Amino acid sequence: MQMQRHPFLLEKAGERPIHGVWHIPSTEAKGTVLFLHGYKGYMDWGAWPMVGDAFAHAGWRFLRINFTHNGTTPSAPKSFNDLEGFAANTYSRELEESTAVLQALRAEGALSDATATDKPLAVIGHSRGGGVAC
């Protein structure tokens, strides 16, 4: 099964944008998975891109995002060099950002398709991202 990757961007007035990557299956999606990275982590760390591909190959839309204060920047998404941003990060901020992403997906209709509005949604995460997902 073929799949595609597409960028995701959620801009909020006066705040840092939330960047992410969609993994899209070539067939009608079974549902959507939102993936949240862990503490001092980022969406491209380790196997997360391959995990997204695996979900898409299995027929799921998969979105992995970077929290805005995770220590990386859009211009250097794999480098932990934003110490000021990381120092301002909180569990509550990550919870608010994941909620904003879910609200944006609902508003855009990304959690459904042309044939159904009852597709399942899963929010999963690694380490602290798993706690935020709960």
Task: List PLM regions with ranges.
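N-terminal cap/lid segment of alpha/beta-hydrolase-fold proteins
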Residues: 1-28
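A generic structural signal for alpha->beta connector loops
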Residues: 17, 47, 59, 118-120
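Short, surface-exposed "cap/lid" segments of acyl-processing enzymes
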Residues: 27-71
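Cap/lid segment of the alpha/beta-hydrolase catalytic domain
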Residues: 68-89
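Alpha/beta-hydrolase active-site loop
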Residues: 84-113
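Alpha/beta-hydrolase fold nucleophile elbow
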Residues: 110-127
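Short glycine-enriched nucleophile-adjacent loop
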Residues: 130-134
